[in-house]
Each structure stands twice: as structure tokens, then as C-alpha cells.
Amino acid sequence: MVTVTGGAIHHFAGFRADRDALALRSAILRVTARVTGWEAVLRVRCSKGLVLEAQHGHFFVRAADLLALPTVDSDSTFAVQVRVEDLSAAQSASLQAALLYTTSKGERRIRVFTVALPICTTLAPLYRSVDGDAVAALTAKMAAKKALDAKVADAREALSNKLVDVLSVYRASFSTPQTPPSQLVLPDALRSYPLHTLGIIKHPAFRAGADVDADRRVALMAHLRTGSVDAILSELSPRLFDLQQVPDSVADTAIVPPTLNLSSEKLTNSTVYVLHAGTRAVVWLGRGADPQLLGGILGDLQGRPLDANLVAGFSLPRLPYAASVRLNGLLDALALDVGRFVPVSLVLEGDPAAAVFSESMVEDRSGGAASYFEFLVAIQKQIQEKVKR
């Protein structure tokens, strides 16, 4: 229903009031307080020589360039794919989106967005000016559409093929005779594109196996179809922090500190890690962590053992200890950065619930998928074969 009415899905797996009540309350408050438009229509137009090929988001398609939106809100994102047919005689190309809607006060309004872009005759300026983050987000939306229209396996295959197509054209156009055949040649603007593509393939929405239930998979795909560029990238490449490396000033400055690579190779069980993956945050407690550090985060457990049962329903307190101040300061900075409440779950090293942490280590081999290094090697071989044809 939400896919044609402009709505959204909020998924609370195995709902527990002691764990999820705050997240549910926050979601309800945001839905009722955010700016919302009603009975809206969105028309997208483009210059002669450009053709609208596909649309992504939650809406009802009235025509190729006209989308009906029973509701539209400030959290909604829509994307369109434009195909170039013939721009040989033009010097610029224009795109325009017009949104007609009714406000909650009953006022009928229209918002118009217009962009004019220069036309290049060579590939160099195109690859130099491409928005790599937008490309990755659109790729995720295309994969979600492919999975819904066909199969998840088809979406994974299409992701690899798309990456090979983009990079093989670049290599064929810009590599030199001195470039080693085994070297992966990447444009600067798309250096993160292979990692983001692997992040999509390993994302629970597309991951192979029966460990992801249907409800979660559908909810995640809905989020990808309607998410903003920043929201999608935070899902594909979560941010990982070592709490002991987070500065004490984070509570005062609200500045998000540098992140770690998404690989377990250099992780240790003697600390506490914080993983931020867009709509959720995970606090991973190492079993070898300093008891003083754990006590500063959890407080006095009154003799209760630190195990999975305790952690599962634990509500993170705000304590006057350095570790608690740093942790809550970091979580507050992350929430401020994404502009919304971020539900936090605690997991203990080695427990089944910690799988939510390990599955976000995109650079590792996991779930039957290759590591980042293995993925790059496989992609490079496919590029070599494609360029030789």
C-alpha cells in the first residue's frame, strides 16, 4: 500500500517495549510533526533529446512524467533516470520538477526546481564532475526496483554488471599503454563506488540466504527506494568508532570524529565500538574490555552478570562518568548529524545478537560474499575481458 500512497514503513523486529518504546515514540512524533503535503502531483520535464526512463520512490504513476502523491513529506526522496537520445545540437540540457500540493492548512502551493547543465563532447569532464554519492544512491534504488520486479539474485548480478560497465568505459578511454593490465583504473569522483557497490550487495535487503526474514527485507528495500543520498550511504557504508579514541570534547562540540575501516582485521575485544548505520546504532561490548570502561557505560549492575539477557533489554543510561559522557555525546552528535532520533542497541561480543554488528563489516568476507579485496580482483578481471572484446 505505501508504495503507491507516498507512505513509509517502520519495522520493529521482535518488538519489546523496554527496548523499542523510545524508537516507536520518536517515529510517531516525527510523522505527526514533520512538514507534510497532501493530494500532490509531481511532474518532471526535460529538454529535447532527453527521455525519462524510470522513477524511484513511493508514488502512483499517472504518466511517464507525472506522479501522483496522496501524501508527500520532508523525509521523502524521489529519483528519476534520464536517458540521452540526441543532444548533438544543444549546448545545455535542462531538467525541471514541479510539485503541486496542499498544505496542512489547506493552502494549494506549487514548488518548482529547475537545473540547467552544460553538455560535454568528451568523457573526461563527465567523469571528473560526476557526483559519486548520488551515483551510489541511485544504484541502490535501481537494485531495489530490480529485486522487486525480478529476483534478489538478479539485482546482485545487475549491480556487478553496472560497476563493470562504468569502469570498463573509463579504462578504455583513459588508460595508457603503460597502465598494467591488472591495475584497477578509477576516476577520482568514483573511487568509493566499488566499495558502495559491495555494500549494496552485502546489504541485508539483497544478501543471499535465509537469515534475513521477508518483513525485514521488504522494510529495508522500502527505505532504499525512498531514502535520501546521505541516508542510503550511511546504510551502505556505516560509520565505525572506537569509543576509547573518541575525544571527550565530542559532548560539547557535537562534531563526529574520524571513523575506522569496516573490517574486523584490526578490531580488538578489549574496547567498545559504536556502529552507526543510518537508521540505527549498535554499541558492541568487547568481553575483554576494561571493567572500569564497561562500568562507566552501564553503571552499577548490582551483581547481575553481563550476558546476552541483560544486554538485550538494557536501556543506555546517562552517567557522570567519562565513558558514558563520551558515548552519549557521540550518539547525540550522530543524531544531530542525521537530523533524527537514532535507536541504540547493545550487543555483547560472541552473542547471536552481535551478528548485526559483524554483518556491517563490508570489507570482510561474510555471508558467502567476497571480501573487498577479492571483489576488486574479480571486477578487474571482468573489466579486462570486457575491454579486450
Task: Annotate each PLM feature.
Residues 1-389:
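Extended acidic, low-complexity intrinsically disordered regions
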